[in-house]
Each structure stands twice: as C-alpha cells, then as structure tokens.
Amino acid sequence: MTNEKVNKVALIGAGFVGSSYAFTLINQVITDELVVIDLNQDKAMGDVMDLNHGKAFAPHPVNTWYGDYEDCKDADIVCICAGANQKPGETRLDLVEKNLNIFKGIVDNVMKSGFDGIFLVATNPVDILTYATWKFSGLPKERVIGSGTTLDTARFRYMLSEYFDAAAHNVHAYIIGEHGDTELAVWSHANIGSVPITELMKKNDQYKQEDLDEMMENVRHAAYQIIEKKGATYYGVAMSLARITRAILHNENSILTVSTYLDGEYGADDVYIGVPALVNRNGATEVIELALNDTEKEQFAHSVNVLKEILAPHF
C-alpha cells in the first residue's frame, strides 16, 4: 500500500472552457482524480466518457468521473468554469448580474459539502466573481484565486517573442490589473534574457514604440477578436488554469499573475485583481509588489477603481 497524497480536482462547468481544462489536466499529468459537475448531466457524462476512452493514451492514469457537489468535500481544488458566456460585443463586466446569481448557488452548494480546499475561478468577469466567491465561501483570501491576467500575460509574452524574435520562455513581462479593458503592461519590468526592452529599443531603430502600443491593444482585445471569429475563447484560458492548478498541487511557489486579494499592496485594498503572486499548495500566499512607474501606478489605480465601482452595489 501507499500513503502518497492523491490530488483531486473538482470541475464545475463542462462548457468550452471546462472541457478544455479537463482535457489539459489529463494530458499534462497534473492531477490524480478529476470529477466533472454540470447542470447538464448528459454533457458532463459525455465528456467523462470521451476522456476515459482516451485513457490508454494518457501519460498518467487520471481517475475521471461525473459527480455532484458532494464530491467536492475532499477536493484540493474546485475550479469554477460555469456561468453565462460572453457574447460578441459584450464586455466581461456586462456579465456581472447574470453570473453573481449563478455563483451564489454554486459556492453555497460546494461549501455545504464540507469543502476546505482552494477555489480557482475562471468565469468572467473573473476579478468580480473571485471576490464574490471569497465573500460567499468565507474561506481565507489566499485560498480563493482567479485566473486573473495569466492568459493576458502569456499573450503578451508570445507577441513580444514574435516581435523581438526570441523564445517566449525567455521573455519576462507582465500584464496586471483587471482581466479586461483596463489591464496594463508593466513595461518598466519587461525584459528579454535579462535585457530590458527599453534598452533593446535604444539599440535598434527597427523597434518602434508605436508597434509596442499596438501590441498592447492587441493583447487587450484578443478575446474579442477570437470571440468574433469562433464564438468563444477556451484553449488559452484552459492552459492558464492548468498552469495555476499545477503550481498549487505540485507546491511550486511559482509566480503567476492570478487574481488575488490586495490588502494595501499597490496602494489598493479590498479588491481581487491580477498581479504577480506566489502560488503554492496553500493558494496565493504572497503578493509580489513590483515598483511601478508613475504612469503604471495611475493606470493600475484606474483599473482598481473600475472594479470597485462594479463591486459597490453588490457587496
């Protein structure tokens, strides 16, 4: 017999994002057990059947089944992907009213099971709904995490790698703030192989500031472009969720731009927002406070204020 810890993830919501997340978990050897929960039982059961039929090809056997809220009791992570989808022309913040009501029911049911793990929230507007999950659950703030700007940061690094012709894993740069229209690039800390991008710009006149400005707009509007072309975004965010899940279950102490609670950091308080944070088995345990320049401070404060204005009528 073995006494090794068995990692368990409960996924709530088997839509585009949820099913893509489940597929990624199984193929990246991240968890030992995965339970899929959805109001549409046939969809969830169909996903589980489909995933299990490929088990012979998976790099690691993952015990996958369809379940209900009671199965959350001993889960290490409950990942919420359920909720109303963003429609073409609709902002993430337009979804607030619809999804707050949905989340109250979900979180209440999860907590009734005796759940005492970590919530990982993917549904938009993710910063608002992560705050709501924290309020509804009563869990410590570090054990409620949103996907935040992890995907935006990945998009940013990809675009920078293409522009500067460098491998994406050698690009170090962050997108912080609201996962949405007020997010910002931290240009003052962006570098490639430890060389600041500002230095690269000075050394080579083929690099233009207007190109970087356009790049930031492309990062900010990437989701809208994808939704317009294919109806929804799901692969990228699923991979971001899987990355956060790995950091938690494998106790990595990785720094990821998750949506986490601020209590004075960056001059803000009582808000969940995307910033670099230390992520491990205990959740988002420490906010990494970057020294922002004056422009970045102003942009970040604006992002915080937008979120607080949305939260104010509800909490």
UniProtKB/Swiss-Prot annotation:
UniProt record similarity statement: Belongs to the LDH/MDH superfamily. LDH family.
Chief location category: cytoplasm
EC numbers, comma separated: 1.1.1.27
Pathway(s) where this gene product acts: Fermentation; pyruvate fermentation to lactate; (S)-lactate from pyruvate: step 1/1
Tree of life domain: Bacteria
GO MF terms held by the record: L-lactate dehydrogenase activity
Active-site residues from the entry: 179
Cited Pfam families: Ldh_1_C (PF02866), Ldh_1_N (PF00056)
Positions contributing to substrate binding: 86, 92, 124-127, 152-155, 233
Residues noted as binding NAD(+) in the record, renumbered to the chain: 17, 38, 43, 69, 83-84, 122-124, 147
SUPFAM superfamilies per record: LDH C-terminal domain-like, NAD(P)-binding Rossmann-fold domains
Cellular localisation: Cytoplasm
Subunit structure: Homotetramer.
Activity regulation (record text): Allosterically activated by fructose 1,6-bisphosphate (FBP).
Catalysis: reaction(s): (S)-lactate + NAD(+) = pyruvate + NADH + H(+)
Protein keywords: Allosteric enzyme, Cytoplasm, NAD, Oxidoreductase, Phosphoprotein
Functional summary from the UniProt entry: Catalyzes the conversion of lactate to pyruvate.
InterPro entries (alphabetical): L-lactate/malate_DH, L-lactate_DH, L-lactate_DH_AS, Lactate/malate_DH_C, Lactate/malate_DH_N, Lactate_DH/Glyco_Ohase_4_C, NAD(P)-bd_dom_sf
Binding site for beta-D-fructose 1,6-bisphosphate: 157, 172
Lineage: Bacteria, Bacillati, Bacillota, Bacilli, Bacillales
One biological process term in Gene Ontology: glycolytic process
Phosphotyrosine, modified sites: 224
UniProt name for this protein: L-lactate dehydrogenase
Top enzyme class: oxidoreductase
